[in-house]
């Protein structure tokens, strides 16, 4: 109730700093052309997200800590994949990687690197069954940042995965095709399980969290197609879902604010 009536959230220490760092991380992921810098910006975004979630209260701290532990595993796998690519090619520049990785497309190291990227980004983007952090994170996130986090936190890793699959890796390679097939299967499972779990929830934000698991499944299926139509579909759905999910969180916040102000006995 203090959040919607007294605007106490505006005075929470570190809120604007964390929000600014989150924006910096997202912007850096877009403009960078280096896979290690991408890791740095991804972690700036993630650490800021952990902090914004933790500002929401006691339950938020537990949700943020759980997200931190799981997210660190995803980041470590991504960094391990970067290490394998560097060992094979001797460069971290994306344009150079795309050219130098070609002779190694059938090597075991490349297969391990692809697996690390798929699992690492899968954790970060809450792909089923690696979505365990998302329901609590969305439900207990700081109300002043929940809409932004819901719209961007899982889409940014999806964007990074798109850059790897379509720009650095070759989608016609058997190793990459096998990884994309697994990604597609997980996407279908995520759509089914996420939708069923969303319909079973009584908390609006938790329902939207499981709905996001299903929507990430659609993006994964677009990626798994490995062609231009799948690429266009994945990008359009990622943009659409970012705006749609943020808007739904804002709508829910508006309803809660209205009922708290109009109905004194209403509990948010």
How should these model regions be labeled?
Residues 1-6, 23-36, 48-268:
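Hydrophobic transmembrane alpha-helices and their helix-loop junctions in integral membrane proteins
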Residues 10-15:
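Membrane-interfacial loop-to-transmembrane alpha-helix junctions, especially the N-terminal start
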Residues 18-21:
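Mid-membrane cores of alpha-helical transmembrane segments in multi-pass membrane proteins
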Residues 43:
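Short phosphate-coordinating micro-motif centered on Lys-Gly-acidic
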